[in-house]
C-alpha cells in the first residue's frame, strides 16, 4: 500500500522536539508539494510571531524574507488581514488571491486596511491556501501554503488539497503536544519539573558561564550552583550539561541569549 504524503509527514514530525524543527519540516514539505512558501500562526489573534531559541523569527528560518516578517509584526498586519479573520469563522480550507479583486473577495466589502494588507502580500506571493485549525480552549491557528503564480493556484490547491489539510492539522496538533510537555516540565506537581533556580542556572550555563560565575550571579555558593545544574541534567535525562541545555532549548524552557 502506497504511503501518503501526510503519513510521511507525520512520521517525520513525530521526531521533532521543538517548534523550530517542526516548522522547518513544514517548510520542506511545502516545497516538496510544489508550494513556494509556508507560514503558520498558532493563535490567529496574536500579532507577534514565534521565534527560534536564538531570537530569530521562525518565519525567516522557513525562507521568508526578513523584511516581510518584520513588517508583519511591526505594522500589525495580522490585525487587518482578511484571511486571518476568516479563519475564526470556518473550518474549511480558504483558497485566496492577494489581488483584492480576486474570486475569494468578490461580494465581500473589504475595508481599506484589509485591501492594503492583501496588496502588501503581493510583493512576496500571489495566492495561497489557508487551513484553519481550531485548537483546545477556543483558539484558532492556521497554516498557509503560498504560491508565486496565481495562474497555478487553483490547480495546486486541488492537487494537494488532502495533503495540505491533513498536514496542517497534524502540525498544529504536534505543537500543542510540545506545548503541553513544556508546561508539564515546569509544573511543580511533576517530580521531574525544573525549579526556577535550576532553569536560571541552566540559562546562565547556556550563555557559557562557569559554575563559579553562576554562583556569583545567583549569590550562592559554588556547591549550590553545581547542585542545581546537576539536578537539571538528571531531571532532563541528559548525558551532560551541554545536552541538558540543548534539551531545555528545544522544549522552550530556556532561550540562548
Q: What name fits each language-model region?
A:
Residues 241-252:
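Short, basic, alpha-helical segments at the C-terminal edge of helix-turn-helix-like DNA-binding modules
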Residues 1-12, 19-20, 141, 147-187, ...:
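Juxtadomain coupling helices with adjacent low-complexity linkers
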Residues 210-243:
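Recognition helix of helix-turn-helix DNA-binding domains
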Residues 205-209, 248:
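Short helix-to-turn junction characteristic of helix-turn-helix DNA-binding domains
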Residues 12, 27-129, 134:
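Regulatory input/activation interfaces that engage signals or partners
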Residues 197-201:
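The N-cap/first-turn positions of alpha helices
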Residues 133-143:
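Short hydrophobic/glycine-rich mini-motifs in sensory/regulatory modules
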Residues 218, 254-256:
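Alpha-helical protein-protein interaction scaffolds
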Amino acid at each position: 500500500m502506497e504511503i501518503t504524503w501526510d503519513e510521511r509527514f507525520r512520521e517525520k514530525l513525530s521526531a521533532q522536539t521543538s517548534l523550530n524543527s517542526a516548522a522547518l519540516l513544514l517548510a520542506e514539505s511545502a516545497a516538496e508539494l510544489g508550494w513556494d512558501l509556508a507560514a503558520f500562526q498558532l493563535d490567529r489573534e496574536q500579532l507577534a510571531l514565534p521565534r527560534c531559541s536564538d531570537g530569530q523569527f521562525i518565519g525567516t528560518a522557513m525562507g521568508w524574507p526578513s523584511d516581510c516578517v518584520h513588517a508583519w509584526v511591526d505594522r500589525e498586519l495580522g490585525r487587518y488581514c482578511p484571511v486571518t479573520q476568516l479563519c475564526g469563522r470556518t473550518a474549511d480550507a480558504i483558497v485566496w488571491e492577494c489581488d483584492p479583486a480576486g474570486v475569494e473577495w468578490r461580494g465581500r466589502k473589504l475595508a481599506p486596511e484589509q485591501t492594503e494588507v492583501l496588496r502588501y502580500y503581493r510583493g512576496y506571493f500571489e495566492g495561497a491556501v489557508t487551513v484553519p485549525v481550531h485548537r483546545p480552549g477556543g483558539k484558532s491557528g492556521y497554516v498557509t501554503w503560498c504560491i508565486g503564480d496565481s495562474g497555478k493556484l487553483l490547480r495546486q490547491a486541488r492537487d494537494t488539497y488532502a495533503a495540505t489539510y491533513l498536514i496542517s492539522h497534524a502540525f498544529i496538533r504536534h505543537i500543542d503536544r510540545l506545548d503541553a510537555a513544556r508546561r508539564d516540565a515546569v509544573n511543580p506537581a511533576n517530580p521531574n519539573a525544573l525549579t526556577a533556580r535550576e532553569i536560571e542556572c541552566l540559562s546562565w550555563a547556556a550563555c557559557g558561564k562557569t559554575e563559579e560565575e553562576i554562583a556569583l550571579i545567583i549569590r550562592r555558593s559554588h556547591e549550590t550552583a553545581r547542585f542545581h545544574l546537576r539536578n537539571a541534567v538528571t531531571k532532563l535525562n541528559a548525558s551532560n550539561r551541554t545536552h541538558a541545555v540543548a534539551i531545555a532549548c528545544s522544549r522552550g524552557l530556556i532561550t540562548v541569549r
